[in-house]
């Protein structure tokens, strides 16, 4: 009669313990209120140029007075009404022309990609996911569109309308610029441009789709989702409440 097989060895206790996830990297959230675009543009370039390997990443949340911005490869012909009264600022982000104004959340992501071991495409994907999840929190279905950066309404009579824009600049391995989400705003200035270079592209806001949340609530949701996609859900859940409170730093 063959002998019984040896019992399998008990696993090493140390080997059976899942490794701890890497510690979340600090992210400072700054609530800048309503700030002129030029001031933010100059400040984020200065911040990026001055940062060191030890500088914490930051997210700046802001609302701009009316302004058009044209990306570094942008075509000025996409501004259809030259005398609209809204200033045009040429900037160094990717993308074409877009509009910023009251009722829109703008979030600038000042992130050290090398320290986080992120490729640019990965960062863009995580930002897009954060926006999609933010909109879903208000029962708005949205999605990416191949070859057209930003987030678009996924269903209903406004299917295909753009509700969020995205454009980054990478300098010395660090990002600046970021994204915008239309909450409740005057959409007429978008009619004077080809948004992001697409003639006839409809632009929509959350209020027009039936969402009643205010700017501050949506901004807080967005910040949590951005941090969750940078550092994980645990880091987002642990974000202190004061980090989500409005202040002018």
Swiss-Prot record:
Question: Domain of life, per the record?
Answer: Bacteria
Q: Which Pfam families match?
A: LplA-B_cat
Where in the cell?
Cytoplasm
GO MF annotation terms: lipoyl(octanoyl) transferase activity
Q: Which GO terms describe its cellular component?
A: cytoplasm
Q: Where is this site: Lowers pKa of active site Cys?
A: 162
CDD domains, sorted: LipB
Residues annotated as binding substrate are 93-100, 165-167, 178-180
- Any miscellaneous information on file? In the reaction, the free carboxyl group of octanoic acid is attached via an amide linkage to the epsilon-amino group of a specific lysine residue of lipoyl domains of lipoate-dependent enzymes.
HAMAP family cross-referenced by the UniProt entry:
LipB
Q: Which family does it belong to?
A: Belongs to the LipB family.
Q: This protein is called what?
A: Octanoyltransferase
